Amino acid sequence: MFLAIEDERNPMHIGNVSVFEGPPPTYGDFVRTVAANLPLVPRYRQRVRFVPMELGRPVWVDDAHFQILYHIRRTAIPQPGSAEELRNLAGRVFAQNLDRGKPLWELWMVEGLEAGRWALISKVHHCMVDGVSGTDLLTVLLDREPKPPPTRAPDWRPAEEPSDLHLLADAAADAILDPFNRVRGLPIVRV
């Protein structure tokens, strides 16, 4: 649903700005930490695949060309690194739609905040998390439970992407079964 109502002027992503005390981790360490935690949120390596001719609901497929460095960006705001400058940057980041040809998330590591602080700007499409109960990458990264730092990301191999024919066959099966699912959800009325 959130994909269907999104357009250029109405992005459907959820944004978050988190500010941290102290110096930031190195960009390389941060990327390695995110990569090591991606197995906990497999959706973050998947992209949306649309059924040909829009005959069915979009499906999630592993992104065979996943590049973590596309999703984790690093930037700095100009001195003095005020909250207003951070808000302006976040506004520019949030104003841009996510690329639907890739997994629908971005993390921006922001350096240069006043008082030696740094920030993380997170942007995730609403179809991936609901903002309340959905597990997202930021939740995993900011877990308060002590754990050893990840050493390296486990090897990952994307699943084979379904063919157009497979997607159309699944859409046809859903169309046949869907009336039964709709009826099953109706209330029983006794006269």
Sequence positions of predicted segments:
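Soluble acyl-CoA-dependent acyltransferase catalytic core bearing the H(X)4D motif
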Residues: 6-11, 15-191
